[in-house]
């Protein structure tokens, strides 16, 4: 029983940490990256960039930690899906780290650009564009990995009734919409800055906060823990 309770609390806390740090990190530097003179602005806001990227790194590790905390519980009900969720969320973490590395390289490029003045400006601009593209594509692929992993553990939650089905159904739908939005962005049919993209991702954002509070306050269904035999074994 302690394993279920402790892991539920840890997963809930990590859900909050992953979401909050990701939002704070990305939103704080968005105006800088969107500026027309971003190569100058990045260098001028070096401290903010470093703090924001540290927050994104925390988010990346917390994201992987969520599935790792859930794995000992979910494997009792469906080991393949539990393992798959860990794999995809670790992949998500790695992709976000790639995005962070791209922005750290962009910070170095920005500093060199400012020091060089007008010399080789076009080369700096091309390099900056490529690094921003790496960050963008890594982020979208990270969303795909996240939503795939999330849908796997929501399926196990739904089948096992460890958490209420209305909450897991909400999570699965939200993850599916978020996955669709990322695929549409990669296909060039949707902008990551569009209202549609934001709406498609809002559902899973709210649901994960509700799930986090549920896991921390109530944990997993005690009647399922006490009496229900593992499924999928």
Q: What label would you give each PLM region?
A:
Residues 1-233:
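Hydrophobic, aromatic-enriched alpha-helical segments typical of multi-pass transmembrane helices
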């Amino acid at each position: 029983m302690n394993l279920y309770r402790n892991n539920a609390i840890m997963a809930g806390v990590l859900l909050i940490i992953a979401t909050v740090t990701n939002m704070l990190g990305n939103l704080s530097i968005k105006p800088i990256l969107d500026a027309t003179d971003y190569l100058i602005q990045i260098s001028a806001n070096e401290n903010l960039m470093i703090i924001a990227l540290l927050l994104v790194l925390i988010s990346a590790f917390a994201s992987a930690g969520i599935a790792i905390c859930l794995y000992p519980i979910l494997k009792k009900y469906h080991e393949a899906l539990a393992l798959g969720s860990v794999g995809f969320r670790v992949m998500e973490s790695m992709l976000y780290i790639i995005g962070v590395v791209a922005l750290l390289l962009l910070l170095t490029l920005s500093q060199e650009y400012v020091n060089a003045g007008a010399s080789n400006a076009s080369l700096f601009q091309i390099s900056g564009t490529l690094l921003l593209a790496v960050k963008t594509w890594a982020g979208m692929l990270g969303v795909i990995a996240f939503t795939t992993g999330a849908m796997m553990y929501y399926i196990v939650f739904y089948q096992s009734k460890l958490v209420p089905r209305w909450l897991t159904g909400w999570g699965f739908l939200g993850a599916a919409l978020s996955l669709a939005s990322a695929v549409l962005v990669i296909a060039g049919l949707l902008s990551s800055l569009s209202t549609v993209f934001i709406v498609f991702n809002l559902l899973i954002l709210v649901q994960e906060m509700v799930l986090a509070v549920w896991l921390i306050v109530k944990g997993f269904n005690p009647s399922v823990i006490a009496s229900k035999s593992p499924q999928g074994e």
